[in-house]
Amino acid sequence: MIEADRIISASPQREEEVVDRAIRPKLLTDYVGQPSVREQMEIFIKAAKLRHEALDHLLIFGPPGLGKTTLANIVANEMGVNIRTTSGPVLEKAGDLAAMLTNLEPYDILFIDEIHRLSPAIEEVLYPAMEDYQLDIMIGEGPAARSIKLDLPPFTLVGATTRAGSLTSPLRDRFGIVQRLEFYNVDDLTSIVKRSAACLNLNLSADGAYEVARRSRGTPRIANRLLRRVRDYADVRNNGVITSEIAKQALVMLDVDPQGFDFMDIKLLQAIVERFDGGPVGLDNLAAAIGEERETIEDVLEPYLIQQGFLQRTPRGRIATTRTYAHLGISLSE
């Protein structure tokens, strides 16, 4: 199954972009959760503005859907500068990056999503740009080729990635600020759901907000998607009023259980328990057993299951925990 087809997928979906922009916080004061990140960024931004300097280059990493792009835009708004957005796979040629860099104004932000997917050639262009605000460009070809240096205005590179370990050391070491985004707790997600409901003029009870939040896998993007689907259900079944009971009914219809699991999560956990006696089981064997790519298991399914204590990664393989048996209604003695 394609990850983006899941209602609880943390991957962005194109049709959600317009609504997401409308409900996205613009300033740190509106940014809910991630208290350590918020406090640090407030200090770093104020210090840069006091010194009339560009903010240090910033790397933001963490699971998808936690607000890396949102934070990059907030930084630009707080600094009062423009932000130019691109992504690693889009920057295929050094000239593409050079064009973006030379069009930056002083202190502007260049935001590169999926920065771990930059090609080595693009990284080579970035190194002097990040360190010295200089751009090395080759003019001509063959024996007549020569290198010229262009001065760039002071700027901030903000890179976002779900796979910080895939960044090369030379690139990672050039970021002066590194921030990791963690899964959100239910209280913070409830606040996010309430804020989104207010932006969308929804009639949402506090209990209804909590019901959506607790099934959102610690991820704001999922919370906002579930809220929109619950709104649809409430519009048809309850005159647009979202109560706790209406939210529960809608989420049951969507096959999202109280833990935020869908059938793919249950399929994975059941495979470990029923086919491999609870583990340990190697990733390749597990992928074959459930018919999914190992990357999908490693990057999409496992992080939340591990964070919630349903799965353990060990040197010998994946192991189901006692919480898994309890959730599946299976006795450990069976």
From Swiss-Prot:
Keyword terms, alphabetized: ATP-binding, Cytoplasm, DNA damage, DNA recombination, DNA repair, DNA-binding, Hydrolase, Nucleotide-binding
CDD domains in the record: AAA
Binding-site positions, DNA: 294, 313, 318
Head domain (RuvB-H) as annotated region, ranges: 258-334
Reaction it catalyzes: ATP + H2O = ADP + phosphate + H(+)
List of residues binding Mg(2+): 69
Pfam families linked to this entry: AAA_lid_4, RuvB_C, RuvB_N
EC nos: 3.6.4.-
Residue positions binding ATP: 23-24, 65, 68-70, 131-133, 174, 184, 221
GO cellular component, one term: Holliday junction resolvase complex
Keyword Cytoplasm included in the entry's annotation: yes
Subcellular location: Cytoplasm
Region Large ATPase domain (RuvB-L), annotated ranges: 4-184
Gene Ontology biological process terms in this record: DNA recombination; DNA repair
Keyword Acyltransferase: no
An example molecular function term from Gene Ontology annotations: ATP hydrolysis activity
Enzyme class, UniProt record, top EC level: hydrolase
NCBIfam families per the UniProt record, alphabetical: PRK00080.1, ruvB
Complexes and interactors: Homohexamer. Forms an RuvA(8)-RuvB(12)-Holliday junction (HJ) complex. HJ DNA is sandwiched between 2 RuvA tetramers; dsDNA enters through RuvA and exits via RuvB. An RuvB hexamer assembles on each DNA strand where it exits the tetramer. Each RuvB hexamer is contacted by two RuvA subunits (via domain III) on 2 adjacent RuvB subunits; this complex drives branch migration. In the full resolvosome a probable DNA-RuvA(4)-RuvB(12)-RuvC(2) complex forms which resolves the HJ.
Role summary: The RuvA-RuvB-RuvC complex processes Holliday junction (HJ) DNA during genetic recombination and DNA repair, while the RuvA-RuvB complex plays an important role in the rescue of blocked DNA replication forks via replication fork reversal (RFR). RuvA specifically binds to HJ cruciform DNA, conferring on it an open structure. The RuvB hexamer acts as an ATP-dependent pump, pulling dsDNA into and through the RuvAB complex. RuvB forms 2 homohexamers on either side of HJ DNA bound by 1 or 2 RuvA tetramers; 4 subunits per hexamer contact DNA at a time.
Similarity remark: Belongs to the RuvB family.
Name of the molecule in the record: Holliday junction branch migration complex subunit RuvB
Organism (species): Haemophilus ducreyi (strain 35000HP / ATCC 700724)
Upper lineage: Bacteria, Pseudomonadati, Pseudomonadota, Gammaproteobacteria, Pasteurellales
